Amino acid sequence: MDMHCKADPFSAMHPGHGGVNQLGGVFVNGRPLPDVVRQRIVELAHQGVRPCDISRQLRVSHGCVSKILGRYYETGSIKPGVIGGSKPKVATPKVVDKIAEYKRQNPTMFAWEIRDRLLAEGICDNDTVPSVSSINRIIRTKVQQPFHPTPDGSGTPVGTPGHTLVPSTASPPVSSASNDPVGSYSINGILGIPRSNGEKRKRDEDGSDGSGPNGDSQSSVESLRKHLRADNFTQQQLEALDRVFERPSYPDVFQTAEHIKSEQASEYSLPALTPGLDEVKSSLSASGNADLGSNVSGPQSYPVVTESFASHLYVKQEPHEASLTPFTPSSLASSGLADIQPFQMALTVDASTPTYSSFTHHGPHYGQFGSQPLIAGRDMSSTTLPGYPPHVPPTGQGSYPTSTLAGMVPGTNVSVHHSVQPVECCSCLSSSKPCLFHCRTGSGSEFSGNPYSHPQYTTYNEAWRFSNPALLSSPYYYSATSRGSAPPTAATAYDRH
């Protein structure tokens, strides 16, 4: 093509180029384009050639053409500028000598005064005059020579005689910097505090066994240990320090038996902890109050005395000043067991303190309990009950272990009667209608040994589901007219949400 056959003025002027651009033209890094190429770019622009065509014809990058044309349209100049580059050096040797001369004549002369004098005497013009910061830098680096103190303490800076600056205060001489390299880095050496000869001699004696600055670290530790041992510590403290020094920095997580002291092992052994546990148990049993039932959040176990009566006892619970309803589970309140319970009670020696015991219930109550007695530690809902549907989950609202149920009803004033007496339930006390539990048949008979017979049902409907807890009252559920013949206790014990 004819583009490549044309002579390139830039190539002719700069045979030793630094690189080739994308258009095939050569250039030199860090150098502006020659004036010939700049003039040619301006001429082609006056002829109406587009910048992209100028870039192709002259093999100059499009950015360079645009920059040159933009500066030409703004300033009318095609000379390269200093935009983004370094300024020309204004601190020429002539200017530096003049600044030094002004400073010798008047050492208290300011930099701006030197700048004004350079302009007034015509040494520099507005374009070449150095700035105030440049003048200060010239004075600091070239006029003021570095300060070299002499051994006698009178500092004399090296420089041209007659115009050197003497500092106001002479620096103190550094003493014994070469004789005592270790002491110069100590606190006394840094602060310049002289040490006594006895201290130096003791340090030399302690360090004479191979603990120099280039010695082994283990020997330095031994020398430090000897130094501390001779001055401050007793024999017991030294033994404790030796044990600490020999201990590894990062001990294992699982310590072995030899790392534990004998007194600690005896202190935290199981026989030593057993009396403490007994005291805690006794204090817990003695500190029971009426608020225990409301604070119980899950199944808990209480100690049970082994001595018990084999005969069935009828015990009437009489709380002092509180009702059993706030701290009794819903299953007890709904089944009529909150007031009077027939159970096999375990008696303690001191009857004045509140006691908690497990009980065994033998009377079937309206399908709530089966013919089997409750076993301590077993859930009520885990037993097979005759009238419950098979799809009810084993855990429900009334799922409490027997020990928890026994502990929720504190036996404060327990009166034991060996004679058989008729039992009254909540329904009998609060309503004049016949009791569904058959607790009083005719003239004060006992509980009926036969289970309550009722037709089994397999499905629930919305009529049996109650979400309002205000409906859980004894007269409502144990009334024959309000619920009919179906057992409401079974439905409410497992369907209350």
From Swiss-Prot:
The keyword Glycoprotein does not apply. PROSITE patterns: PAIRED_1, PAIRED_2. Keywords: Developmental protein, DNA-binding, Nucleus, Paired box, Segmentation polarity protein, Transcription, Transcription regulation. Induction: By activin. Weakly by bFGF. Residues 94-142 are annotated as: RED subdomain. It comes from the Eukaryota. Gene3D superfamilies: Winged helix-like DNA-binding domain superfamily/Winged helix DNA-binding domain. It is found in: Nucleus. The keyword Acetylation does not apply. Residues 143-224 are annotated as: Disordered. Its main location: nucleus. InterPro entries: Homeodomain-like_sf (IPR009057), PAIRED_DNA-bd_dom (IPR043182), Paired_dom (IPR001523), Pax2_C (IPR022130), PAX_fam (IPR043565), WH-like_DNA-bd_sf (IPR036388). GO terms for biological process: negative regulation of transcription by RNA polymerase II; nervous system development; positive regulation of transcription by RNA polymerase II; regulation of transcription by RNA polymerase II; segment polarity determination; sensory organ development; thyroid gland development. GO terms for cellular component: nucleus. Expression becomes spatially localized at mid-gastrula stages and is confined to the nervous system (midbrain, hindbrain, spinal cord), sensory organs (optic vesicle and stalk, otic vesicle), visceral arches, developing excretory system (pronephros, pronephric duct, rectal diverticulum, proctodaeum) and thyroid gland. Splicing does not appear to be tissue-specific and tissues displayed the same spectrum of splice variants. Residues 19-75 are annotated as: PAI subdomain. GO terms for molecular function: DNA binding; DNA-binding transcription factor activity, RNA polymerase II-specific; RNA polymerase II cis-regulatory region sequence-specific DNA binding. Residues 16-142 bind DNA. Residues 166-178 have a biased composition (Low complexity). Probable transcription factor. Involved in kidney development, acting synergistically with lhx1/lim-1 in pronephric morphogenesis during the tailbud stages. This is Paired box protein Pax-2-A. It comes from Xenopus laevis.
